[in-house]
Each structure stands twice: as structure tokens, then as C-alpha cells.
UniProtKB/Swiss-Prot annotation:
It is found in: Cytoplasm. CDD domains: Mth938. Keywords: Cytoplasm. Residues 6-122 are annotated as: MTH138-like domain. This is Mth938 domain-containing protein. The keyword Repressor does not apply. GO terms for biological process: negative regulation of apoptotic process; positive regulation of fat cell differentiation; positive regulation of transcription by RNA polymerase II; transcription by RNA polymerase II. It comes from the Eukaryota. May play a role in preadipocyte differentiation and adipogenesis.
Length: 122
């Protein structure tokens, strides 16, 4: 099963190939995608992305996880989250969201089992 390509990104809107949903923030993994609802884990810009935010994607068996910090990189990624991913043997890439989408799509094209969590506003 391959990871779906991110078809488009603009402020507050993301489209994933194979999904009719327009996402504000989203999670993607081999074979699927869904809304990333920060309320599920109490996530805020700071301290930022928590292990609980990425756990679902990790459990899908990804080799690499790309984190999009927002268009202005307002979303933090604490070292505890990076350590959690590394402990699970996952290569992690933390980037500004436009760059993160480019990196994610390049990895998809290479056939990597890649997942991602992306914030499409600030």
C-alpha cells in the first residue's frame, strides 16, 4: 500500500489524492488520510506536536514521518516527540509546511512508506 500524494496546499486548505475532504490540518499514511483534530490530544502551537498526535501514523508502519509546522512555522515540535519517533526507528523530517509537502510528495514518489502530520495555517 502506498502513501497518498498531497494534491494541493493553500492557507487553511489541503487536498489529498483519493479523498474528497478538504483538510485544514491532516494526517496521512500508507493507504489513508484524515483530519488532524488538535482537540483530540489538547495540542496547541506551544508546546506543539505531541507523541499522541503522531502515534496513529506510527502505528501504520511508516519508515519516515514528515511534520509540517505551518506556513509561518508557528507550530512547535518538542524534542520529546522527535525522541519518541526515533525510539520507534522512524526517520523524522520537521519543516515549514510548504517544504514539508514537497518533501513528503518526493518520498511518496520514491516509494517510501511515509506518513505525515501537516498544519496548513500559521
Amino acid at each position: 500500500m502506498t502513501s497518498p500524494e498531497i494534491a494541493s496546499l493553500s492557507w487553511g486548505q489541503m487536498k489529498v489524492k483519493g479523498s474528497n475532504t478538504t483538510y485544514k490540518d491532516c494526517k496521512v499514511w500508507p493507504g489513508g488520510s484524515r483530519t488532524w483534530d488538535w482537540r483530540e490530544t489538547g495540542t496547541e502551537h506551544s508546546p506543539g506536536v505531541q507523541p499522541a498526535d503522531v502515534k496513529e501514523v506510527v502505528e501504520k508502519g511508516v519508515q519516515t514521518l514528515v511534520i509540517g509546522r505551518g506556513m509561518s512555522e508557528a507550530l512547535k515540535v518538542p524534542s520529546s516527540t522527535v525522541e519518541y519517533l526515533k525510539k520507534h526507528g522512524i526517520d523524522v523530517r520537521v519543516l515549514q509546511t510548504e517544504q514539508a509537502v514537497k518533501e513528503y510528495n518526493a518520498l511518496v514518489a520514491q516509494g517510501v512508506r511515509v506518513g505525515g502530520v501537516f498544519h496548513s495555517t500559521c
